[in-house]
Amino acid sequence: MLKKLITTAVLAMLIFTLAACGTTLAPYDAKKDLGEQINYTITGIDAGAGIMLATQNAIKDYHLDDDNWQLQTSSTAAMTSTLQKAMKDKRPIVVTGWTPHWMFTKFDLKFLDDPKNVYGNAENIHTIVRKGLKEDKPSAYQVLDNFFWTAEDMSEVMLEVNDGVDPEEAAKKWIKNNPDKVAKWTDGVEKVDGDEIKLTYVAWDSEIASTNVVAEALKQVGYKPTIQAMEIQPMWASVATDAADGMVAAWLPNTSGIYYKDYKGKFEDLGPNLKGAKIGLAVPKYMTNINSIEDLKTSK
């Protein structure tokens, strides 16, 4: 009798496990409330990112918390992986999105309208250097001050990296293929002989691209650059405390605004190296009736 009960229990557990493994979220259904289909979850990235803070504000300002919407912390890689899997089966998903980023080139995505302007207007990505860099390393200062490119330029490098190319190799390829643009950063800059320079960055795809490219440009005038990835707050602190020489990863005025304010007076802002960046919530274009953050609310 005991043996029969154990066998029955094992079979029941096996059936349950197989059923669970075979369960996947259904394709998007425009006739049903979105929240119910994705457990009222927005798929996000690193907890300290400015877009995550803005999204927490969006949940409150649009009263999404009334429906118990939540923001799931992960990483950029995990978020894009989840997005890719969802879109393969045309499942519903809401993610924190920003441009420039390769996901907007590779996938058919759209930003949700933000009528309350919680995410702010278009952002620019600034170059920030430590105080005294102009005097200590004038050639590096000049290259960093000259560094400017477009969202399309950045996307080229990001797509290469996403396809498996090493970031340094992708940067070298872009430098080789764009001599006229690079010349605008390096022409007239006095060369050095192996002087060291340290750049820090947050490990977002966009900043991996820009930091590796500017490091290659610095090599062209004789520098030996070191680049180090870290979280966003330590990145700002590294420049403000002279632990690093600079970074090209300051999304302003929104994403990095809090850190700009916290460390103001302890760094030099060289201005934008890329204009027209944007952050917000994004969904696949096949979610045709979800066009605004307000559309996330449960229908009454």
From Swiss-Prot:
Membrane association type: Lipid-anchor
Subcellular location: Cell membrane
SUPFAM superfamilies reported for this sequence: Periplasmic binding protein-like II
Gene3D superfamilies to which the protein is assigned, alphabetical: Dipeptide-binding Protein, Domain 3, Glycine betaine-binding periplasmic protein, domain 2
Lipid attachment points (N-palmitoyl cysteine): C21
Pfam family for this entry, one: OpuAC
Record function comment: Part of the ABC transporter complex GbuABC involved in glycine betaine uptake. Involved, with BetL and OpuC, in osmoprotection and cryoprotection of Listeria. Can also uptake carnitine when carnitine is abundant in the growth medium.
Quaternary context: The complex is composed of two ATP-binding proteins (GbuA), two transmembrane proteins (GbuB) and a solute-binding protein (GbuC).
Name of the featured protein: Glycine betaine/carnitine transport binding protein GbuC
Protein's organism: Listeria monocytogenes serotype 1/2a (strain 10403S)
Phylogenetic lineage: Bacteria, Bacillati, Bacillota, Bacilli, Bacillales
